[in-house]
Amino acid sequence: MAALEKFLVEYKSAVEKKLAEYKCNTNTAIELKLVRFPEDLENDIRTFFPEYTHQLFGDDETAFGYKGLKILLYYIAGSLSTLFRVEYSSKVDENFDCVEADDVEGKIRQIIPPGFCTNTNDFLSLLEKETNFKPFGTLLHTYTVPSQTGGETFTFQIHKADMTCRGFREYHERLQTFLMWFIETASFIDVDDERWHYFLVFEKYNKDGATLFATVGYMTVYNYYVYPDKTRPRVSQMLILTPFQGQGHGAQLLETVHRYYISFPTVLDITAEDPSRSYLKLRDFVLVKFCQFLPSFSRERLLQGFSEDMAIQAQQMFKINKQHARRVYEILRLLVTDMSDAEQYRSYRLDIKRRLISPYKKKQRDLAKMKKCLRPEELTNQMNQIEISVQHEQLEERFQELVEDYRRVIERLAQE
């Protein structure tokens, strides 16, 4: 019996080891590429990878059943016409311990629209016709970015489009697939809802004497109704594709979108849906740029504390709501505060902490009411003291995080 048990344990271990050889990390198996020239197909420098694949491949972000798995998703840089192919060196035998390989191709087909290429020749034929691709919608803004190596500058355009633009619906179906790889909680929107607005970033470049355009990124904005006669545009999705990140395109896009809506008297303010920390930093930078020269945000006014005039002027001039205006004030006040001066530093720190402590105070009041019903008075007081101690630590930690974020905004502002 002992020999049999030993055999079964060893057999199970051997099987698990064998199966592990057929597990692939989908974050590295999926290879993305934006193709401008035929030689880009073989250029590994052009390849980039997803940050997330859990929506298709589960929380462990793995595909089972393959060795050397490669999931190729190559896009023509402008039109995003797609080459999709699955490659691997070996596949698990269907009879191997009653297991089957994951349907990798089926999972990818869930998010990419039909009409993609499966062989290179068809893809290259479409690439030859790329000169016919032009940006959709209305041109809102043109800007340039200098080359990181110096000398050359690159030209970019931001357009506003909608579903009435010829070919845009199909283009958007291809574009939105990138969301699944780079936004953790991404989902596709209802494009038949006319309240969606689309803002697109393109690079303008030359190829063999012709002018072409490459997709850089995009933003979707939903226009909510605000009683009785206003709207509140809310940023829903924003993505700058990996090869273009770190070049300032996010700030250009967000600033352009804000300036677009500022021109409409019916717009109350501009918000964002579940903003990430990186988005908040970007918005901080853009809104501070807007407000830094407003009279209500002068050095003298900033040192006096946040005022209703600041909130009103930020809303009237730039459609910034009171909560965001308060954050702008905190950044600009840090800019004019001498942090080496003990009194100025103390005044600034207390001002920020007064805002941060408000939700804690409410929580404390609610907790005290509940504990009076459930605990003796002495125990309640003791637990409240512990709670307060923890709150002070959390407040200080949060304050330091904010100051660090604010300093980065100020440093970036100084580089403008």
UniProtKB/Swiss-Prot annotation:
InterPro entries: Acyl_CoA_acyltransferase, HAT1_C, Hat1_N, Hat1_N_sf, Hist_AcTrfase_B-typ_cat-su, Hist_AcTrfase_HAT1_C. The modification N-acetylalanine is found at residue 2. One of its GO terms (biological process) is subtelomeric heterochromatin formation. The gene is Hat1. The record marks 196 as: Interaction with histone H4 N-terminus. Acetyl-CoA binds at residues 238-240, 245-251. The modification N6-acetyllysine is found at residues 6, 12. Histone acetyltransferase that plays a role in different biological processes including cell cycle progression, glucose metabolism, histone production or DNA damage repair. Coordinates histone production and acetylation via H4 promoter binding. Acetylates histone H4 at 'Lys-5' (H4K5ac) and 'Lys-12' (H4K12ac) and, to a lesser extent, histone H2A at 'Lys-5' (H2AK5ac). Drives H4 production by chromatin binding to support chromatin replication and acetylation. Since transcription of H4 genes is tightly coupled to S-phase, plays an important role in S-phase entry and progression. Disruption phenotype: Homozygous deletion of HAT1 results in neonatal lethality but survival to at least late embryogenesis. The structure of the vertebrae in the neonates degenerates near the base of the spinal column. Catalytic subunit of the type B histone acetyltransferase (HAT) complex, composed of RBBP7 and HAT1. Interacts with histones H4 and H2A. The interaction is dependent of the ability of RBBP7 to bind to the N-terminus of histones. Component of the histone H3.1 and H3.3 complexes. This is Histone acetyltransferase type B catalytic subunit. One of its GO terms (molecular function) is histone binding. It catalyses: L-lysyl-[protein] + acetyl-CoA = N(6)-acetyl-L-lysyl-[protein] + CoA + H(+). It is an enzyme of class 2 (transferase). Coiled coil: none annotated. Belongs to the HAT1 family. Keywords: Acetylation, Acyltransferase, Mitochondrion, Nucleus, Phosphoprotein, Transferase. Its EC number is 2.3.1.48. Residues 59-61, 222-224 are annotated as: Interaction with histone H4 N-terminus. Its main location: nucleus. GO terms for cellular component: chromosome, telomeric region; mitochondrion; nuclear matrix. It comes from the Eukaryota. The modification Phosphoserine is found at residues 187, 340.
